[in-house]
């Protein structure tokens, strides 16, 4: 609710609150289904040791009877540029305080998407990440501290999530994180650190495609964006 005011990302797909589900009529559910779940809005991805003719046979057997419907054009209002900081403080009886900082970032096909992904890895991937070394190991101010991207199709979020140790206020925790971000922005990344994180990404992408299920899902994912051939060029974007 803080990051998005217009775009549907402001609430979960299933609804903003439980009452939305409770108030849904069966006609509303059917209308949603028949609008979005159509052959025109589908991608069939197959990764298996099968002849193409056999794939056609099975595809026709299981899917040809599905009725085609009107094409749906996805048209969502873009989120306006955020010009001021938004804050929300929640008080609850919990074991540890938690701090979340979110920055708007590029969409999944944008030029800066992979830059943000790489930055999140440099900051917090494993015990060689800057956050771990500086704010958990050397100067233990956090129990946990991570940076990650949401991976959204439209303009997404770069998120930093941390749990400060007892005695470290949320304000102090925020200042420590901002100091690390300012330092990151003011200095060039060393070639060794940069290459190490690129290698980790390349390894993850490679191992990710070892199973047929992951291959099929990735092929469909890239076809959704542009072309399934994008699966072969993803690492080059880093």
Model-identified regions with their sequence ranges:
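An aromatic/glycine/proline-enriched structural segment found at the starts
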Residues: 5-6, 10, 38-39, 43-107, ...
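Short amphipathic alpha-helical signal-transduction/dimerization elements
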Residues: 63, 123-127, 178-186
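Short, conserved charged micro-motifs
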Residues: 52-56, 111, 168-172
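Peptidyl-prolyl cis-trans isomerase
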Residues: 24-26
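M16 family metallopeptidases and their MPP-like homologs
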Residues: 1-19, 41-47, 97-107, 133-238
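Active/ligand-binding-proximal structured segments within catalytic/core domains
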Residues: 101, 111-123, 131-133
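Conserved, carboxylate-rich catalytic/transport cores that coordinate ions
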Residues: 33
């Amino acid at each position: 609710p803080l990051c998005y005011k217009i775009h549907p990302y402001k609430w979960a797909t299933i609804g903003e609150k439980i009452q939305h589900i409770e108030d849904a009529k069966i006609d509303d559910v059917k209308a949603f289904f028949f609008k979005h779940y159509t052959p025109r809005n589908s991608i069939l991805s197959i990764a298996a040791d099968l002849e193409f003719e056999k794939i056609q046979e099975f595809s026709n057997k299981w899917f040809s009877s599905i009725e085609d419907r009107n094409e749906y054009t996805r048209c969502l209002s873009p989120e306006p540029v955020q010009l001021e900081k938004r804050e929300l403080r929640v008080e609850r009886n919990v074991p540890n305080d938690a701090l979340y900082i979110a920055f708007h970032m590029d969409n999944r096909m944008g030029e800066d998407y992979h830059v943000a992904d790489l930055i999140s890895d440099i900051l917090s991937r494993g015990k060689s990440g800057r956050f771990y070394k500086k704010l958990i190991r050397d100067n233990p101010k956090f129990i946990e501290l991570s940076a990650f991207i949401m991976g959204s199709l439209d303009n997404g979020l770069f998120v930093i999530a941390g749990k400060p140790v007892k005695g470290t206020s949320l304000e102090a925790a925020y200042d420590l994180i901002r100091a690390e971000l300012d330092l990151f922005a003011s200095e060039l990344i060393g070639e060794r650190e940069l290459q190490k994180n690129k290698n980790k990404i390349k390894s993850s992408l490679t191992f990710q495609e070892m199973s047929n299920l992951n291959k099929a899902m990735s092929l469909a994912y890239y076809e959704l964006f542009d072309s399934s051939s994008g699966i072969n060029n993803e690492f080059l974007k880093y």
